[in-house]
Amino acid sequence: MLVEVLLNTPAQLSLPLYLPDDETFASFYPGENPSLLAAIQSAVHQSHGSYIYFWSREGGGRSHLLHAACAELSQKGEAVGYVPLDKRAYFVPEVLDGMEQLALVCIDNIECIAGDEQWEMAMFNLYNRIVETGRTRLLITGDRPPRQLNLGLPDLASRLDWGQIYKLQPLSDDEKLQALQLRAKLRGFELPEDVGRFLLKRLDREMRTLFMTLDQLDRASITAQRKLTIPFVKEILSL
């Protein structure tokens, strides 16, 4: 999925970001987060501005939900922006200029700008412009609650603490298995329960790692024309 983020530069360039097209609301397994999922979906479908901040210590689907929100609106022809602040070395704070004109702005990993005066001020100014226009949906993620971000700009910390704040609860092992089986089903193949539990036992349980491994196994299964079994998985992953 291509999402175009407008850059307010002298050349009026745009920064195209390719987001995973398999990270949608349909492929997100909510676990104990149905309220957060419902809040984001409601915000996306509203015609007026709103603000949601959600956080988790270990990732656990934060980026997935932002990608899903972008996909939902971009498919309707709406202008959206996604800014991964863990990759801010590739762009400048001015990337935020003018984003209040977009239907949706997603800011990922805001903890990464803590202590960076220019980025903090740019984010503070964007927040204020979005509030003034009242049209843009703003979704922000972090690895901790807003008040614990160690930001150098107190007013930004205060702004981020307004609105709806959620903790993204981590999935249990049983929920991770169901999330893997959902992803497999959407890709058109079956992940047997014993194979899924084997993966959870032998691999890093971080969901991004598990999904990447599932993709690898899917490709290997297609190439070898074999179903997913524990012996086949051991062979492919050298376990």
From Swiss-Prot:
Subunit structure: The active form seems to be an ADP-bound monomer. Forms the RIDA complex (regulatory inactivation of DnaA) of ATP-DnaA, ADP-Hda and the DNA-loaded beta sliding clamp (dnaN).
Species the sequence originates in: Yersinia enterocolitica serotype O:8 / biotype 1B (strain NCTC 13174 / 8081)
Family to which the UniProt record says this protein belongs: Belongs to the DnaA family. HdA subfamily.
Pfam family, any one: Hda_lid
Name listed for the protein in its UniProt record: DnaA regulatory inactivator Hda
Cited function: Mediates the interaction of DNA replication initiator protein DnaA with DNA polymerase subunit beta sliding clamp (dnaN). Stimulates hydrolysis of ATP-DnaA to ADP-DnaA, rendering DnaA inactive for reinitiation, a process called regulatory inhibition of DnaA or RIDA.
Gene Ontology annotations of biological process type: DNA replication initiation; negative regulation of DNA-templated DNA replication initiation
Listed Gene3D superfamilies: 1.10.8.60, P-loop containing nucleotide triphosphate hydrolases (3.40.50.300)
Keyword check for Lipid biosynthesis: no
Keywords: DNA replication, DNA replication inhibitor
